[in-house]
UniProtKB/Swiss-Prot annotation:
InterPro entries: DUF2726. It comes from Haemophilus influenzae (strain ATCC 51907 / DSM 11121 / KW20 / Rd). This is Uncharacterized protein HI_1631. Keywords: Signal. It comes from the Bacteria. Pfam families: DUF2726 (PF10881). Residues 1-28 form the signal peptide.
Amino acid sequence: MEFSLQYITIFIFVILFLIGLFSSKSRSTRRNEKKSRLYLSTENKINIVNKNDHLDVVILSKYKRKALMNKSEYQLFLRLEKLLSKGYQEFRLFTQVSMGEFLESIDKEAHFAINSKRVDFLIVDKNGYAVIVIEYQGQGHYQDNAAKRDAVKREACRKAGVIFLEFQPNYGKAELEFVGENLKRYLIKN
C-alpha cells in the first residue's frame, strides 16, 4: 500500500507540473498576441504595440495619392527628359531615388548614413549605373537640416564617382547644357 501511495503522489506531482508548464506557455503566447495588436485611441490615433507589424498599420490607416514632385521639380524633370531624348538616349532619368539603391558601401554605418536619403533626379547609364545626381534647390531644400543632408549626399556621390549637380530655382539653358557636357564626357570615358 505504501508503495502505491508513493506512485500516486509522484503521478499527481507530475500532472501538476505539466499543468503549470502548459498554462505558463499559453499565458506567454497570449501575452505575445497582445503585443502585436493595434487599437484606436479616443483621439482616433493608431497606437501600435508592435511597430514591426506594418500590415496592421496599413489596414487601419487611410491613404491618398500625392504628386511625386512639386510643379517646379516637374518642370525640371520634363526639361531633363527632353535633353536626354535629343541625343542621350542611352541614359535614363529617375526621380526621388533612395541613395541606398544606387550607392553601396561594405561599411554598414556608411550605408545607413545614405540609405534613407533621396535625390531629386538621377541619370543612369545603359547598364543602370548612376552617372549624375541633380538636386533642385527649391523651397523645400531650405528646411530643417537640408544643408547637412545635401553635404552628405554630395560627399557620398563624390566618393562613388557620381557627378553631383545643384540647380537653383532660376536655372536656365546653361545648367541643362552642363548636364549634356557631363554626359558627353561620360560617354567618352566609358
